[in-house]
């Protein structure tokens, strides 16, 4: 197992970040942690032209990769999908010789616009969020990464500021020590 001071790369992908109170609350403490690198994909790549070698270098330099994004149409925002397709290339993350991410950890941190009850067979979305997120889990497996249980903030816009602050504190504790069993 890795040391408790694991280096965390937090890849943040929100096309309307200025409107997301929940994500701002989650990100604020992460920016202060010495072991966490926050990388805002929409701020870095507003034109969607991703610097693949830079992104791959960031991945190589970190132990835990966190993908923080809002759930959009049962998936991630478009830039993050483009990032997956371009950065997690064969020969780097998968395929012959593609073992650069093997043994690292993958965690999704997701905000939704609906309550948890919407994500079940009798709910509005008809499927559990774990089913909807299966492509991310499969991508982590393809990269030989350890899949960590996603952190989900359901109905993020309807959470009170005190509820969001509580999530933010728990998230900060987890980011500071992400490989301790029983963490957030």
From Swiss-Prot:
Keyword S-adenosyl-L-methionine (UniProt): no
Would I find Chaperone among this entry's keywords? no
> What protein family is recorded?
Belongs to the NAD(P)H dehydrogenase (quinone) family. KefG subfamily.
Please give the Gene Ontology molecular function terms for this protein.
Answer: electron transfer activity; FMN binding; NADH:ubiquinone reductase (non-electrogenic) activity; NADPH dehydrogenase (quinone) activity
**InterPro entries found in the cross-reference section:** Flavodoxin_fold, Flavoprotein-like_sf, K_H_efflux_KefG, KefG/KefF
Which top-level enzyme class is recorded in the Swiss-Prot or TrEMBL entry? oxidoreductase
Q: What is its EC number?
A: 1.6.5.2
Q: Name one Pfam family in it.
A: Flavodoxin_2
Instruction: Specify the taxonomic lineage.
Output: Bacteria, Pseudomonadati, Pseudomonadota, Gammaproteobacteria, Enterobacterales
Q: Which GO terms describe its cellular component?
A: plasma membrane
- Catalytic activity as recorded in UniProt: a quinone + NADH + H(+) = a quinol + NAD(+); a quinone + NADPH + H(+) = a quinol + NADP(+)
Assembly behavior: Interacts with KefB.
What's the protein here called?
Glutathione-regulated potassium-efflux system ancillary protein KefG
**Keywords, sorted A to Z:** Cell inner membrane, Cell membrane, Membrane, NAD, Oxidoreductase
User: The organism sits in which domain of life?
Assistant: Bacteria
Q: How does it sit in the membrane?
A: Peripheral membrane protein
GO term, biological process aspect, one: potassium ion transport
Per its database record, what is this protein's job?
Regulatory subunit of a potassium efflux system that confers protection against electrophiles. Required for full activity of KefB.
